[in-house]
Amino acid sequence: MSGQVTLQSSDSVDITVERAVAERSMLIKNLLEDLGESEEPVPIPNVNESVLKKVIEWCTHHKNDPQSTGEDDDNRRRTTEIDEWDQKFMQVDQEMLFEIILAANYLDIKALLDVGCKTVANMIKGKSPEEIRKTFNIQNDFTPEEEDQIRRENEWAEDR
């Protein structure tokens, strides 16, 4: 079993990384097991070079973390706390943040997906619908009447 693996981004850039780093992705880990020993680059068709490099940076930092067993999922999901290194890592523009989340989902890196989703959750926590729309540049397509109806239907969920 070789110590290195080459990943090929969607824009055809080859990036060589430690196998242990690449195997933080369950997709890549399963692919490597299925392919056996191969010098061929592993194609990652849905992730471009800049996003793949960010994902690899995260995987390198977390390569010695225990893989998620599923049992710790409930505890992990209940909190929106993010460790300091991950918070700094996620200080990127919105487009890159969403690209990282999509890549983590595609590559099946649950812990990175969690960190990305918690980052977004923390961005909207405590904000009004108007503030959330402004944060994410979302157009309001409700009429004032529809907005009033939705507000009445969801009164129970509002913090008072």
From Swiss-Prot:
Origin: domain of life: Eukaryota
Q: Name one Pfam family in it.
A: Skp1_POZ
Renumbered to this chain, region (Interaction with the F-box domain of F-box proteins) spans 101-160
Keywords annotated in UniProt? Ubl conjugation pathway
Tagged with keyword Membrane: no
* Pathway recorded for this protein: Protein modification; protein ubiquitination
Per the UniProt entry, what are the Gene Ontology biological process annotations, in alphabetical order? protein ubiquitination; ubiquitin-dependent protein catabolic process
- Which protein family is it in? Belongs to the SKP1 family.
Name of the molecule in the record: E3 ubiquitin ligase complex SCF subunit sconC
Name its species. Answer: Talaromyces marneffei (strain ATCC 18224 / CBS 334.59 / QM 7333) (Penicillium marneffei)
